[in-house]
Amino acid sequence: IEQKPLVYSYLVDESADEVVAGNASMALVYSGEAAYAESLSKDLDYSVPEEGSNMWIDSWLIAKTCKHQENAEKFLDFLCREDIAMKNFEYVYYATPNKAVYDKLDKETQENKTIFPDDETLNNCEIFRYLDEDSIALYNKLWKELKSK
C-alpha cells in the first residue's frame, strides 16, 4: 500500500499503451504487448527479472461433451493452417508454435528475445498453478484493500 502513490495505475492489458503514450515509465506486461509496444517505440525494452517470472500458454481444447466435435476440429485445423497462423502471429506478437510460420519469419524476428525468449530465461520462469480457496480469499482481500485506499 505504501507504493500506491508511486504507481500510475494497476492495469494489465492497457499497460503497454500507457507506456507508449508516455503516461507511465514502466509496466508489467505480457510479452506480446511488449513486442507490440517495442514496434511502436524504439525507446522501449522488455526484460524478465533475474528472479524469474511466470509463463503462460494460450490453449484451445475440445470438451468431451462437445456437440459439434467435427466443426470444433475443423476450427482448430483452420487455426493451424500456415496462412492463418501467420496472420495470428502478426496480429498478437506472441511466439508461434507453428514451425512453418517460424521458418518464414525474418531473422530479426526469430532472434527477438521479447517474442522468443532463450532457454536461460525460460528455465528461470514457472507456470502459475491454481490457488486453493484460502489463498484466493486472501488474494481477493488484499486486492480489495489495495484498490480501496
Q: Which stretches of residues belong to each language-model region?
A:
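Non-transmembrane alpha-helical segments in soluble domains
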Residues: A16, V20, L28, E73-C80, ...
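Mature extracytoplasmic/periplasmic domains
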Residues: A63-N123
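Extracytoplasmic/periplasmic, Sec-exported soluble proteins
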Residues: V7, L11, E51-N54, A63-H68, ...
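Periplasmic-binding protein-like
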Residues: I1-E2, L40-C66, Q110-E111
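Solvent-exposed loop/turn segments at secondary-structure junctions
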Residues: G32-A35, G52-N54, K67, R81-A85
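Ligand-binding pocket segment of bilobal, Venus flytrap-like solute-binding proteins
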Residues: I1-P49
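Conserved C-terminal helix/tail region of periplasmic/extracytoplasmic solute-binding proteins
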Residues: D119-K149
